[in-house]
Every structure is written in C-alpha cells, then in structure tokens.
C-alpha cells in the first residue's frame, strides 16, 4: 500500500509538469516529417512514428536547454547530440539502423530549408 501511494505521488509530477509543445515546435516537426515522408515514401503509420519521435526530440532538447540555462552554442551542441542519439535509437528499433540514419539525414536537410 505504501509503495503504491509513493509511486502515485512520484509519477504525478512527471505528467503535471511535462512540457507541452509550442506551436512553433509542432510546425517544425510537421515540416520535417512531411519532407522526410515525401522523400522516403513513408506510410501513414511510419510517418506518425517519425513525427512523434521528432516532436519528442525537439521538445526534450528545448526543455533540457531551458532547465540547464544553456546559452553557449557549444553546450547546446552536446544536448542536441544526445537528442540525436536518442531519436536514432528510437527509429533504429522501428526501421533498422540504415534506414533510421537515412531518415535523420533527410530530417537535417529539411531543417536547413
């Protein structure tokens, strides 16, 4: 009983304080996803998986930078690299390593446009 109550009190703040994506983050994730989906002919299901992973990475990176109060571009690169590795791992589980890398390269192309 104590473990259950403790678990509930520890898990609630995770959901209450979880950061919601901003309109710009959603727009950015949609732009990247649409570009990648068109280039690689992703199914709707695969497109949704890629969108969720991309949006999660964008939101997580922004939250981590804000949490740490990072302003230095070199320090931000460390956060972005960690986020890249996380999304690569997620996509590799679904699509395989080679396709995941190709999708992420296309995602980087979309960011530059």
Regions found by a protein language model. Give the residues of each.
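Charge-rich (acidic/polar
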Residues: 19-113
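Bacterial Sec-dependent N-terminal signal peptides
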Residues: 1-24
């Amino acid at each position: 009983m104590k473990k259950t109550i403790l678990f509930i009190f520890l898990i609630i703040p995770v959901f209450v304080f979880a950061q919601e994506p901003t309109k710009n983050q959603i727009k950015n994730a949609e732009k990247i996803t649409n570009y990648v989906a068109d280039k690689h002919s992703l199914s709707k299901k695969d497109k949704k998986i890629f969108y969720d992973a991309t949006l999660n990475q964008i939101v997580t990176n922004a939250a981590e930078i804000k949490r740490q109060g990072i302003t230095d571009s070199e320090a931000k690169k460390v956060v972005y690299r960690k986020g890249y590795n996380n999304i690569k791992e997620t996509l590799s589980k679904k699509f395989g390593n080679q396709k995941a890398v190709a999708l992420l390269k296309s995602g980087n192309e979309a960011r530059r446009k």
